[in-house]
């Protein structure tokens, strides 16, 4: 057996089950072993008096009141009984699980896993434990048709078959010894089934180091390629033409835009290869700066390409650049073009008849030839792998590269995370833009907000509603969103059109729903997914985020940035009843500032204390386990050792480091 065999070779996994696992990205045995839990439930029995409010824990005690089931509403019920631990008596509630009543005998000793509510001195039960279980139990993200129990069973089967012994080591022994790291095989086993918390932490550190080290090695290789390729292109752009276009704009650039533009234009005119990151707050005007840089490249006799992650963004940028530069020839290249249209576009690019080329990853496919590519701009660069970025760069004769991200990143972090890139920052908003008014409300205040919304919609405004996020289950995400969408449809019947957007839809279906929203065919858009960064709907003035405390500051700021794109006053409403102090702090900070750089610093401080938010949509590279902010010290160590290895002449041939070179070749192939 080898790890590249399909999943259905495992006993108990048939072809139909394998299809369900494929939705999680698990297609072969290696994918299964490397599909790590995103958290663990601690099943060590705790004392009731030591629990924090909202903490999940196992409490054991003697059953001192009989279990009673109370029914209310449609198919809803509550099972209630009391446990005594020492001298403390507390209530236990199970919702919609009446069948558990048979398991609860008066006078018996019982262990229950649940969530503690200090104010009510009660535990909301999640699981009755028949016997003492392992202290730490993995919790995996799921897809429809897969339960925690079935996934754990399949992973256990893989380990029982000894498949973990086939996992190849990808770090030399010298690094394992120097940084006191577990072997890869040990770490993978301990990530799934740790014997104790310290073992899990060691495994996590090993996997994080591996991810960050190889990321830094890829950056070092890009850096050395730049050096080997020699000097960059010299783009002698026309000062006169660039100034004329700037003057013709219907607005003046902010000082921050002007400074960033000059840094970019200076790089383009120099003989060194530009490799720059342009970061700016949501709505700070990066697109105009990027557009002027592209125009400058054209005045120097070159083509400029802009690569974005989605078709709807490509179309949006195409329209805005067409309006900015009506005299330039633009080409739009996306995956959905029909064969004849695609041939025509490819021909205009190859012949040099297109000045500006805007597109998705279709820009890097085989068969796309550029006549004279001088500048590449990659928007939301964290959405593209290092390999994809390299391919686009190889399409020209070492063209200048500008990467953009819509999320402010603290400078020290940006410099380490993006290796050798120069960083330009737009930290000012265009004049006249009204700050978004942000309010935090409790769930019970939602009816008043819906009444207020009716008035806003009557005035012609459109609304985004983000459905609660439940990390464990995509199926629950969808169920909640459908329920929310139906409730809003009923509430606004005859007054507003409601549409639903979710992650299971095909990309063309998502694009159509967004297009309908842009064209005002719908008034309210309910979404489970974070609305695409940069999607511009000027008429959308209200963003409502349900269970907002489940998002990190950067995600909340990104969501808020979907509104406030026109000249009307815009609003963000955070609906949350946070149980933790950090959740309350996030809500408070969001209502106090709309400055993304202030929020980025706060996010850094809060994460430093061990709070974990996702890096999705954060503008930073994404990893399976590592988090660039949370794991900054590991990132620094990884950067130092990657820098040292890369500085050794012909390190790829050195027996000590050969393993790294081979693994990088495999990674590049996968990217």
Curated annotation (Swiss-Prot):
Pfam families: DEAD, Helicase_C, RecG_dom3_C, RecG_wedge
Motif (DEAH box): 379-382
Keyword Cytoplasm: no
Domain annotation Helicase ATP-binding: ranges: 267-426
The EC number(s) this enzyme carries: 5.6.2.4
Annotated spans, Wedge domain: 44-134
Catalytic activity of the protein: Couples ATP hydrolysis with the unwinding of duplex DNA by translocating in the 3'-5' direction; ATP + H2O = ADP + phosphate + H(+)
Entries under InterPro entries matching the protein: ATP-dep_DNA_helicase_RecG, DEAD/DEAH_box_helicase_dom, Helicase_ATP-bd, Helicase_C-like, NA-bd_OB-fold, P-loop_NTPase, RecG/Mfd, RecG_dom3_C
Keyword terms: ATP-binding, DNA damage, DNA recombination, DNA repair, DNA-binding, Helicase, Hydrolase, Isomerase, Nucleotide-binding
PROSITE patterns linked: HELICASE_ATP_BIND_1, HELICASE_CTER
Superkingdom of origin: Bacteria
Domain named Helicase C-terminal: residues: 445-610
Consequence of gene disruption: Increased sensitivity to UV light and MMS (methyl methane sulphonate), a six- to seven-fold reduction in DNA recombination during transformation.
UniProt remark on domains: The wedge domain within the N-terminus inserts into the replication fork junction, where the lagging and leading strand split.
Cited function: Binds and unwinds Holliday junction (HJ) and partial replication fork DNA. Unwinds R-loops. Plays a critical role in recombination and DNA repair. Helps process Holliday junction intermediates to mature products by catalyzing branch migration. Has replication fork regression activity, unwinds stalled or blocked replication forks to make a HJ that can be resolved. Has a DNA unwinding activity characteristic of a DNA helicase with 3'-5' polarity. Complements a recG deletion mutation in E.coli, restoring UV resistance and poor growth in the presence of mitomycin C.
Entries under PANTHER family matching the protein: ATP-DEPENDENT DNA HELICASE HOMOLOG RECG, CHLOROPLASTIC
Subunit record text: Monomer.
Listed name of the protein: ATP-dependent DNA helicase RecG
Organism: Streptococcus pneumoniae serotype 4 (strain ATCC BAA-334 / TIGR4)
